């Protein structure tokens, strides 16, 4: 049927409405629907956020234990006390190791207008880079500890567990990104760890200085990760706001 010349405006509006509805359907279908179970409703997206937050809580505990172990185990305690003493004296090298974390280069905003106006997709991508920033350094620390002499199993096992949980958390975040933003392009950019050369050096002093940096940074960042996850869960699922 040929439409009269007086109808183009109406047909154009109808086409726009159809396209708009298709886009809304595509967005809704990208997010896992609630699945019925005997016990109630199960939402894969919410459950993945819960899994991520549980992993982040585990990381919090492991980071605490690792930090304490390094200060109390004979393998490292003496040198760590010296590092703290040098930190008070403002030794430049030790101060850098004790206060600077390379992961802050990808740290999401957590206060003020910048935080309130942050786009959720960008916020999620930034968190992926933030979480992933320590996976490479942890991998190298595990390798070095395996070849160092007299390394206690308690220290080695803690680093392994932290690395494993970091990878698990990163996979959860990647899954969330692909489900909520299926067409998003993600460029993972993990900043270089400047203390890697210290870790790879021959002297135990420098290896422990690298671990001094790693333990301080991971100890502090685990607090922030839980906050960021709660923010994202609220923004994306509307739960626990």
Curated annotation (Swiss-Prot):
Cross-referenced Pfam families: Hormone_1
Keywords in alphabetical order: Disulfide bond, Glycoprotein, Hormone, Secreted, Signal
The keyword Signal appears for this protein: yes
Tissues of expression: Detected only in placenta. Localized to spongiotrophoblasts and trophoblast giant cells of the placenta.
Protein name: Prolactin-8A9
Source superkingdom: Eukaryota
Keyword Glycoprotein in annotation: yes
Residue positions with a glycan: 213, 220
Annotated localization: Secreted
Leader sequence segment: 1-30
Single GO term (MF): hormone activity
Gene: Prl8a9
Family: Belongs to the somatotropin/prolactin family.
PANTHER family documented for this protein: PROLACTIN-8A9 (PTHR11417:SF71), SOMATOTROPIN,PROLACTIN (PTHR11417)
Source species: Mus musculus
Primary location recorded for the protein, binned into one broad class: secreted
Cellular-component GO terms for this entry: extracellular region
Disulfide bond entries: 34-41, 101-217, 234-241
């Amino acid at each position: 049927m040929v439409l009269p010349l007086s109808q183009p405006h109406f047909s154009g509006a109808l086409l726009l409405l159809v396209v708009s509805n298709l886009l809304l359907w595509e967005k809704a279908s990208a997010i896992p629907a609630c699945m019925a179970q005997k016990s109630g409703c199960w939402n894969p997206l919410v459950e993945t956020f819960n899994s991520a937050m549980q992993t982040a809580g585990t990381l919090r505990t492991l980071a605490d234990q690792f930090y304490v172990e390094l200060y109390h185990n004979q393998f490292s305690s003496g040198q760590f006390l010296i590092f703290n003493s040098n930190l008070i004296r403002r030794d430049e090298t030790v101060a850098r190791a004790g206060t600077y974390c390379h992961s802050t280069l990808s740290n999401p905003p957590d206060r003020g207008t910048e935080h309130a106006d942050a786009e959720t997709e960008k916020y999620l991508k930034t968190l992926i880079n933030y979480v992933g920033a320590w996976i490479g350094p942890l991998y190298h620390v595990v390798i070095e500890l395996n070849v160092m002499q007299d390394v206690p199993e308690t220290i080695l096992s803690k680093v392994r567990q932290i690395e494993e949980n970091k990878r698990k958390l990163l996979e959860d975040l990647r899954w969330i990104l692909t489900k909520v933003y299926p067409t998003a392009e993600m460029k993972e950019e993990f900043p270089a760890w400047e203390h890697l050369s210290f870790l790879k050096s021959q002297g135990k002093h420098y290896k422990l200085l690298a671990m001094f940096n790693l333990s301080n940074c991971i100890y502090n960042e685990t607090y922030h990760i839980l906050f960021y996850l709660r923010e994202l869960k609220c923004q994306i699922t509307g739960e626990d706001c």
